[in-house]
């Protein structure tokens, strides 16, 4: 049984002798020793999958189909041959492998983690995975989020260059309250950034980026803040329960953490404007 501590949840992974390549970011979160907090057990098993893998709904080559089986959602992955793959059951947090199948090459542990629906284990505990650049500024976390291509990595790197910050994760962070205070946690997936540090920090602010000719910052009203957080939260859009949980978590975060809108250029002044706001010089916008 492999053990990883992610977002204050001890993930216990039983791979059922399925060969895994265990070199990657997930190993940064390995855990040894006792744990008295939340646990999630990922169980893998070998069982026939012909009824699902033979479906014409699944095209060829490393793609998946979404089904409902006995009122449980089911994701089926396969390799070329429709009778060669595995199924992920998000509701029960388990994975079914076709008996006797041989993975050539073996599964990459990081990729397997990314598709095993761990985000749901966070959502049911009032936590979430947020698509954002996670930056450590003096021992506190600031997250830059927004649409793809808006400049999350650019703003994070500007803070590194001009404010002595450090990027903890270039693409994702776990958000969860600890003793009533929201924190940002490291996460094993980091997109194409290549930056993945296992670090937990108190959360100071979430910054929603947009591009513009002038650098301006304001606190977003509650509705806009919740919409921005929800659009950046990882959940299956076809799963109503996950949407409901994600909405609840976004509402809780917006009620306790400043969610700021930063219209910005990719320059040092964008850092200065946001830094001044965060330090309290002009952060008295009505919410």
Regions found by a protein language model. Name each.
Residues 1-148, 158-168, 173-287:
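A noncatalytic interaction/capping subdomain that flanks phosphate/NTP-handling catalytic cores
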Residues 152:
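Conserved lysine of the Walker
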Residues 155:
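Hydrophobic positions on the alpha1 helix immediately C-terminal to the Walker A/P-loop
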